[in-house]
Amino acid sequence: SDWKIFLEFYHKNPRCRLITIDLETGNAEVILDRNTWLGHPIFRPNNNDTIAFCHEGPHDLVDARMWMINRDGTNERKVHEHQPGESCTHEFWIPDGSALAYVSYMKGQQQRYIRKYNPDTDEDSLVMEMPACSHLMSNHNGILYVGDGSGSPVDVKDTCSYKIEND
């Protein structure tokens, strides 16, 4: 597919909001309102007060993709400080809520890494190097992971520098 629209939308700096909706009462509350492409909000399992979300766009143009915020709009914080040429993606909560796991990879390198962020301690740590795959999910307590295969990423502006050689 052509990700040109993805790039164009990023550069428009669209007005985006994170909103919670109480399905019983219909009440909606705006948590965050920005002229930045926000996406992929996910509540922390077993904790309705912590939400992960992303600054969306081509990964090589976004300064820091993954963020956390409290449900009341306070304590906005980066999950990971990106290194130059680093992309971080495919974030998900460990189902027990202990950490947000994600994939990290560097421009010009084949290796990908599983990392996790503990929202209670603000600790971001390397778990292990992984085969080139894309979407991951873990079992309940995060000791087993499953992932699908992946080729070269297309969600970056500079696709030539992020080639993955598959077997």
Question: Language-model features: where?
Answer:
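Conserved beta-propeller blade repeats
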Residues: 1, 8, 33-54, 82-103, ...
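Short, conserved, GDST-rich strand-edge loop motifs in beta-rich repeat architectures
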Residues: 1-13, 54-63, 105-108, 147-161
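Multi-bladed beta-propeller domains
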Residues: 21-37, 69-87, 116-132, 162-167
